[in-house]
UniProtKB/Swiss-Prot annotation:
Stored SUPFAM superfamilies: alpha/beta-Hydrolases
Family to which this protein belongs: Belongs to the peptidase S10 family.
Name by which UniProt lists this protein: Serine carboxypeptidase-like 50
Major localisation: secreted
Pfam families the UniProt entry points to: Peptidase_S10
Length: 444
């Protein structure tokens, strides 16, 4: 009996040693590795460069030289596109733990190439040689981004004719129109084959959008009449400062308004009224500060990854309340534009976008305003959202989603972007007109 006990202890010790010494699975499975990643020099800012991660199409339906290329830009200002990569629409993402990458069922690179760029310089893994090199306005943002993208295309000559679609969310509601406007107006015959612009829950015309918060939350039942008046007064302060061209003060006033709104509603996050906790973007920070992640992406181990750069945000502070609506108007006359919003977002949601849309100086606005708003259902017959489209403009309201639409509705967001790029289903094809006025243009 004593010998059996001794043998059992020895075997247990050996098994324990084997289990301790067994290699851990890699943080990044082979399938999760980017096709390419690294740095793109930015002109005219010597020593500065933009970090990128590129994922080729998984199931392309055309030869790769003809396969659409989506360029994703995060908002902020000052937030990294690696949030979009590893938390929203990339092929693998973190869901519950920073050490566990899970396959994304709604990855946007199923049919298309997908390029994430840390924009502008100084954001995420991108490098700004000095603070003076960080852009202070959208013109400079566009110049840097264009230079980086041209470098990317030159490094990959077979990509030079690929149709390019710029996409992004939140403050990229400025970046996306800015790069589109720059290419269409100043580089129409350049190396970027621009085919469309897509903005999710964007901040594009801030002075109009900031005036929608009070009425939006009031009719949602989140504040009472007295609180609505208080919010309206806070909105008016920001608007007045814009009219006086006190741009930094206007941005500060907007921040105070959003803080007031958050305190009044008591929500975990204004980005999604249904969430009990904020979005877990912190998981991406934990992921990308691990040594293996930096090695895989080709980043120096000494670089500390931050979700958003306070320095970049401060440099662009005076830009926050400036409108780029005119850039969207210019683009609509020349290329496809998709505006989509998660319906649970209180910051940059449906009402916020619809208000500035109806003020656009665009030749197709009249026809768009009478176009049918159609019900979009997913494969199971569940309502996924609502689509209104005419000419070059497609507007989509996504049910069950907040600010981060691809996070909340992965497969639906993928179906939307694929349908829009390929011109299929509700997102493409013939224009649909109705004889009665659209509900889009109600007065608030």
């Amino acid at each position: 009996m004593e010998q059996a006990t001794t043998l059992f202890i020895l075997l247990s010790t050996l098994l324990l040693a084997v289990s301790v010494e067994s290699p851990q699975p890699p943080l990044f499975p082979d399938e999760a590795l980017p096709t390419k990643s690294g740095y793109l020099p930015v002109k005219p800012a010597p020593g500065s460069s933009m970090f990128y991660a590129f994922y080729e199409a998984q199931e392309p339906t055309t030869p790769l030289p003809d396969t659409p290329l989506l360029v994703w830009l995060q908002g902020g200002p000052g937030c990294s596109s690696m949030i979009g990569n590893f938390y929203e629409l990339g092929p693998w993402r973190v869901v519950s733990r920073a050490t566990d990458l899970e396959r994304n069922p709604g990855a946007w690179n199923r049919l298309f190439g997908l390029l994430f760029v840390d924009n502008p310089i100084g954001v995420g893994f991108s490098i700004a040689a000095s603070q003076q090199d960080i852009p202070t306005n959208q013109r400079q943002v566009a110049e840097h981004l264009y230079a980086a993208l041209v470098e990317f295309l030159e490094q990959n000559p077979s990509f030079e004719n690929r149709p390019v679609y710029f996409t992004g969310e939140s403050y990229a509601g400025k970046y996306v129109p800015a790069i589109g406007y720059y290419i269409l107006k100043e580089k129409p015959n350049g190396k970027v084959n621009l085919k469309g612009l897509a903005i999710g829950n964007g901040l594009t015309d801030p002075v109009t959008q900031v005036q929608t918060h009070a009425v939006n939350v009031y009719y949602s039942g989140l504040v009472n009449a007295k609180q609505r008046v208080e919010l309206q007064k806070a909105q008016e302060i920001s608007v007045a400062l814009v009219k006086s061209q006190k741009w930094r003060e206007a941005a500060d006033a907007r921040t105070e308004l959003l803080t007031l709104l958050s305190n009044m509603t008591g929500l975990a996050t204004l980005y999604n009224t249904a969430r009990a906790i904020p979005y877990r973007t912190d998981l991406v920070v934990d992921l990308l500060n691990q040594r293996e992640a930096k090695r895989v992406l080709g980043v120096s181990e000494t670089v500390r990854f931050e979700e958003c750069s306070d320095e970049v945000e401060d440099v662009l502070r005076a830009d926050v309340m400036k409108s780029v609506k005119f850039m969207v108007e210019y683009a609509l006359e020349r290329t496809q534009v998709l505006l989509y919003q998660g319906m649970l977002d209180l910051r940059d949601g449906v009402v916020s976008t619809e208000e500035w849309m109806k003020t656009m100086n665009w030749s197709g606005l009249g026809m768009f305003s009478t176009a049918e708003r159609r019900v979009w259902k997913d494969e199971d017959g569940v309502v996924a959202g609502y689509v209104q489209r005419w000419g070059n403009l497609c507007h989509v309201a996504v049910t069950g989603a907040g600010h981060f639409v691809p996070t909340d509705k992965a497969v639906n967001s993928r179906d939307m972007i694929e349908g829009w790029v390929l011109g299929k289903g509700l997102f493409g094809g013939k224009d649909v007109k109705q004889t009665t006025s659209s509900s889009l243009y109600h007065s608030i």
